[in-house]
Structures are given as C-alpha cells and as structure tokens.
Design a protein with these regions (language model features):
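Rossmann-like NAD(P)(H) cofactor-binding subdomain of soluble oxidoreductases
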Residues: 55, 61-146, 162-164
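NAD(P)-dependent Rossmann-like dehydrogenase/reductase catalytic/cofactor-binding core
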Residues: 196-197, 225-235, 239, 243-333
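Internal alpha-helical scaffold of NAD(P)-dependent oxidoreductase catalytic cores
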Residues: 83, 94, 119, 123-127, ...
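Electropositive phosphate-/nucleotide-binding environments in soluble metabolic enzymes
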Residues: 11, 15, 34, 62, ...
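Generic structural signal for residues in well-ordered beta-strands
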Residues: 27, 59-61, 129, 173, ...
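NAD(P)+-binding Rossmann beta1-loop-alpha1 motif at the extreme N-terminus of oxidoreductases
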Residues: 1-53, 58-63, 90
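Structural beta-sheet core signal
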Residues: 7, 29, 101-103, 131, ...
C-alpha cells in the first residue's frame, strides 16, 4: 500500500522534498501563501523559492493544514525551527494517531533549547519522531544532481519503511537510529558554516576554510556526544557530510550570511535581503547556552555568537580564535 504524505512548509527545501515524495506517494504540500498554492497546483512551479524548477505534476498544494494532514500516513515538517511548535500545534487536532512525524528543520528552539523531535514528543507523545537530514542543498537535489541523505528514527523498521518514500533517482536515503546525533549535526553545523562564510568573505583563504571546517567538526561532535549523540554519526552524512556541503557552497544560506558579514555588511541588512531563514543565526544563541550547560568548550561558536549579537567584527572573531592556546588536536581551540 502506498503511503500518503502531508508536508507542512512551502520553502525551497519543503517544496523540493514534497516534489520528491510525490514521485513515490500521494503528497499534499501546505503553504501559507495562497498565491504559492495556486502556482503549484496550476503551473507546477514555486518560482519564489525554486526558480526555473518544474515540480512533480502529481504534487498537490493546499492552504489548509487540516486538508494536508488529515489523511496522511506520514507528516513531514518543513517549517523553520522557530515556527515548528506553532505549526505542529495547529496540525495536532487533525493528525491521526501514531502517524510518524519527520522533521526537516536544522535548528533548535530558542525559548526551550529543544530539538524539533523533542517538541514532537512533547506535543504529540506516541507519534514516532524522526529527521531527514544530510548534505542536501535544495536546488541541486531538485535539478537531479546526485545526493545522499539520512532518515533517522529510533525504530529502524519505521526508518526503513520511510526510506522508500524519500528516495528518488539519484537522491539516495540511508537509515540511522541516532535521532539525537543526526538532528544535532544538522543544527550545529550551521554556525560553522557562518564562520567559513566569514572567512571566505574576508578572503582568508582555503587553508583557513579547511581549518574552520575541521576544528568545527571537532567542536560540534563534542557537544553532540555530550547531549547523547553517537560519535560515528558526526563522521557520516548528518555530520561531516552536511558540514562540508554547507561550508563550501555559495548556495548555503548560512554560508551566505557569513560571507556578507565578511564583506562588511550588517546582520540586519543581510537578513532583510534574504527571503528564507538562515537557521544558524538563531541557533548560535542556543548553542552558546548549551555549551555552558554541558560544560563543553566551543570557541568557534562563541566567536560567531559575539559577531552576531555582541557587535564584534569578523577580525575580532579570528583574533579571538588565535588567543586560544594550542594543545593536542583532540582538544578545543
């Protein structure tokens, strides 16, 4: 029996995933904007978020959350982290019992420091909660470039069942049971992407980028393990894979923010010019607090936080990192 998918969120990644699942399952995508809904239904496009892209013709869009989720066998949450709770609470009365809920957002809730699957467990206990993550730049995947992702659920049987829903052509989806590690890998790497973007914007060079990526992976792995993730997860697609893609690509929103900061623009100006959320900007606040909570030293994240929220410059950030004493490679700094 083919599963029915209800996907909440009409941004670039939500639309891309909906177009993928529509090849394997009946899919309805919810978008807030009625014009977007009409465009998807009538022209099979979403020009605002996926310019020049043709969506799967069977994909249907709706501005009604109820219509999107009431018959769904799988709920996919494609909204930003800070909107996640509100949208899920709106959907809750209409979701059937025990339906799996899959998160696409790569962020943490500021007010609670919670991961998205923790929010699912709080609002909808009993529903299997998981995450689809990895080195997944939406536009590349939509246009058919080869890519790989991870579907993580605590129950491997559910992950395996969902694998076939998301896999399509050159988009290969692997399973994992480390939901904590997979979710944290996606959220934490965004801050490191801002750091590499800053270096690129300031013309710091390839060696600097490589150093930030490598030390950044070490940094996010330390916090991830302290919070319950498994070390091997951070060496895989959800950790290193996602980190390398996001830190190396001009298509990455978080890298873009860092790049523009490195060029001298203000954060306010950069955000006002973007039409989608760069999760790392808000996640940085949470990560600095989590680092204190878990007593984990995260020098790169600390310096990025100071640039974003304390008025430090890009040069201040790099000088700050150079003040850390150099020890063993396995140590912070």
């Amino acid at each position: 029996m083919k599963l029915k998918v209800g996907l909440l969120g009409g941004g670039s990644w939500g639309t891309t995933v909906a177009s993928l699942t529509a090849k394997n399952a009946e899919t309805i995508l919810w978008a807030r904007n009625q014009e977007t809904v009409n465009e998807i239904n009538e022209h099979h496009t979403n020009e605002k978020y996926l310019p020049n892209a043709k969506l799967t013709s069977s994909l249907r869009a709706s501005s009604s959350i109820k219509e999107t989720v009431e018959e769904a066998d799988v709920i996919v949450m494609g909204v930003p982290a800070q909107s996640f709770r509100k949208v899920l609470e709106e959907a809750k009365p209409h979701i059937r019992p025990w339906v799996p809920i899959v998160n696409l957002a790569k962020g943490l809730e500021i007010s609670t420091k919670m991961r998205m699957t923790e929010i699912v467990n709080e609002i909808m206990p009993g529903h299997p909660a998981g995450v689809l993550t990895g080195p997944n730049l939406a536009k590349e995947i939509h246009f058919g470039n080869a890519a790989a992702a991870v579907i993580a659920m605590v129950d491997k049987l559910i992950a395996t069942r969902l694998q076939s829903v998301f896999s399509s052509g050159l988009f290969r989806v692997y399973t994992n049971t480390d939901v904590i590690g997979c979710e944290l890998g996606g959220a934490l790497k965004n801050i490191i992407a801002i750091a590499t973007g800053m270096g690129d914007g300031a013309n710091a060079g390839d060696n600097t980028r490589a150093a930030i990526i490598t030390r950044g992976l070490s940094e996010l792995t330390r916090l991830g393990i302290a919070m319950g993730g498994k070390q091997r997860t951070f060496a895989g697609l959800a950790g290193m894979g996602d980190l390398v893609a996001t830190c190396s690509s001009s298509k990455s929103r978080n890298h873009h923010v860092g790049f523009q900061l490195g060029r001298g623009k203000s954060l306010e100006q950069i955000i006002n010019e973007m039409n989608e959320v760069a999760e790392g900007v808000k996640t940085a606040k949470v990560v600095v607090e989590l680092a204190k909570d878990y007593n984990v030293d995260m020098p790169i994240s600390q310096e990025i936080y100071k640039v974003l929220y304390e008025g430090n410059t890009v040069n201040d950030a790099f000088k700050g990192l150079l003040r850390y004493e150099v020890g063993s490679e396995k140590e912070p700094g």
